[in-house]
């Protein structure tokens, strides 16, 4: 009822919907001229070699989520919201990526991760392997492994890191280092007997074994690293948080053991430990802050769990020590989970936090030598509409009732999901519930226990060296190829001996013409 009254109050104040400055046509003309000047500056392309690469991945962050997050960001700053700018909005180059998997029109996060990290499209449910691998079929994996841009960067001597709000063994991060016929094989405790007997490794073990010199790994997923029934350090009484491994291995200790003599490897599980870290004295960092996924930003314990922004800040400072540069994968992974649960408020606050991390990374690096890319793996069947007035609370009601059942509805809705609610044979009256609550499940048209992904294209925002290569409508697997070209790594090293030629030629041309005239 409180939420209903607040929305009603906002709509009653609609007489002042238009800010005074926006009533003056000159305001819009000046704004357009500033945008035009910015666009004209793009004629001078940044063709530097990218020393550093940062890929920000908003899991499930479709265009409707980006727009709603922009409005939320503005409203959190006590503005109307629509006129706000996300940090990613400030990136000068924008493209669209087609997200389908090789066997799925509407994709999952594993096949898409293989595309934007490894540069090849793949089947849904598989990570780090080609489309020749069938989900769950361990015996189809051998010889079908594909490597990621993280591996390409490491092979060129760069530092590399992974930061996520999900498990570090989840679909997005795992495609950076693992090769698996099933994205859900987090530990050997989740694997079927035939896969174990077939010699396939679980994803947590691959994290330790495949690329042992990853400098930074931060996220959740402690329980997949410890033997079955090992009590969790933070939740010792909770059985669901205990270790899951059947092989008896302590993979945190194994992670320590793989590090070269003389190098300092640090494992942390508490925010205080992370923020107190002296990065100049640490060579390798593993931080696992929850047994499974990290807690939603709105519910986060500020004592024990770091925010995504805090993890990114530590990661960049760690990786910047390498004079050859770095590659960093940053995933705002729980945007996706919020949408699956129909909890739009959780999802959008996760998106705002990812954008906060984008801004922080921008302040810690320079676009002169750092290529930053922000994108999503897929969208969701999330929408907002209803002819809402300017400044309407993003989690509020539309200003109209249904002309069919005569009941109000929230601006935010889902095409399907757990928010399908029938009360007394009719659609639930949302004015009787707290629709502004963090865990409110927005109404959905079709009942499902979990809301589904959407199949439309996703945005790709780019800034820095060679960012102009990301333009138009591209296949999703193009992204790492463009980034690798910018950094002279992986399959795109060949051009690097002449990387400076376009700029050099442009600089020397006037001199050459002058010499010809003098002769």
Curated annotation (Swiss-Prot):
Ca(2+) binds at residues 234, 289-290, 305. It is found in: Cell membrane; Extracellular vesicle membrane. Its EC number is 3.1.3.1. Pfam families: Alk_phosphatase (PF00245). The active site is at 109 (phosphoserine intermediate). Disulfide bonds join 138-200, 488-496. Keywords: Biomineralization, Calcium, Cell membrane, Disulfide bond, Glycoprotein, GPI-anchor, Hydrolase, Lipoprotein, Magnesium, Membrane, Metal-binding, Phosphoprotein, Signal, Zinc. PROSITE patterns: ALKALINE_PHOSPHATASE (PS00123). Calcium-binding is structural and does not influence the alkaline phosphatase activity. At very high concentrations, calcium can however substitute for zinc at zinc-binding sites, leading to strongly reduced enzyme activity. Homodimer. This is Alkaline phosphatase, tissue-nonspecific isozyme. It comes from Gallus gallus.
């Amino acid at each position: 009822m409180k939420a209903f009254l607040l929305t009603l109050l906002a709509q009653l104040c609609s007489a002042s919907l238009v800010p005074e400055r926006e009533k003056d046509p000159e305001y819009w003309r000046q704004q357009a001229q500033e945008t035009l000047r910015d666009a004209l500056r793009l004629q001078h392309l940044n063709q530097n070699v990218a020393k550093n690469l940062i890929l920000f991945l908003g899991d499930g962050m479709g265009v409707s989520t980006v727009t709603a997050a922009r409005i939320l960001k503005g409203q959190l700053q006590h503005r109307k919201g629509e006129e706000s700018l996300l940090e990613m909005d400030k990136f000068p180059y924008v493209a669209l990526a087609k997200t389908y998997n090789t066997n799925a029109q509407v994709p999952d996060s594993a096949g898409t991760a293989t595309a934007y990290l490894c540069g090849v499209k793949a089947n849904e449910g598989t990570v780090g392997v080609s489309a020749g691998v069938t989900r769950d079929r361990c015996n189809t994996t051998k010889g079908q492994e594909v490597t990621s841009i993280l591996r390409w960067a490491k092979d060129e001597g760069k530092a590399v890191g992974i930061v996520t709000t999900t498990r570090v063994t989840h679909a997005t991060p795992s495609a950076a280092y693992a090769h698996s016929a099933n994205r859900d094989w987090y530990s050997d405790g989740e694997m079927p007997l035939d896969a174990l007997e077939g010699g396939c490794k679980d994803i947590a073990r691959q994290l330790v074994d495949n690329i042992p010199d990853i400098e930074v790994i931060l996220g959740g997923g402690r329980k997949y690293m410890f033997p079955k029934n090992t009590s969790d350090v933070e939740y010792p009484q909770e059985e669901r948080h205990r270790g899951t491994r059947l092989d008896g291995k302590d993979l945190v200790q194994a992670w320590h053991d793989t590090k070269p003599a003389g190098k300092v490897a640090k494992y942390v599980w508490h925010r205080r430990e992370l923020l107190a870290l002296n990065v100049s004295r640490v060579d390798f960092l593993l931080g696992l802050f929850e047994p499974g996924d990290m807690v939603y930003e709105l519910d986060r314990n500020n004592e024990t769990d770091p925010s995504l922004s805090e993890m990114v800040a530590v990661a960049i400072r760690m990786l910047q020590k390498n004079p050859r540069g770095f590659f960093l994968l940053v995933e705002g992974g729980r945007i996706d989970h919020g949408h699956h649960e129909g909890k739009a408020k959780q999802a959008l606050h996760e998106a705002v936090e990812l954008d906060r991390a984008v801004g922080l990374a921008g302040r810690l690096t320079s676009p002169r030598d750092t290529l930053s890319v922000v994108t999503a793996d897929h969208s969701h069947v999330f929408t907002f509409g209803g002819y809402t007035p300017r400044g309407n609370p993003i989690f509020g009601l539309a200003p109209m009732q249904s002309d069919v059942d005569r009941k109000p509805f929230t601006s935010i809705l889902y095409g399907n999901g757990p928010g399908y609610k029938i009360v007394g044979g009719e659609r639930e009256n949302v004015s009787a519930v707290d629709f502004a609550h963090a865990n409110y499940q927005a109404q959905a048209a079709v009942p499902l226990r979990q809301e589904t992904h959407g199949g439309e294209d996703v945005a790709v925002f780019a800034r820095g060296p060679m960012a102009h290569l990301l333009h138009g409508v591209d296949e999703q697997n193009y992204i790492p190829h463009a980034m690798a070209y910018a950094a002279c790594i992986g399959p795109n090293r060949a051009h690097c001996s002449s990387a400076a030629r376009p700029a050099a030629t442009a600089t020397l041309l006037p001199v050459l013409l002058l010499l010809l005239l003098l002769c």
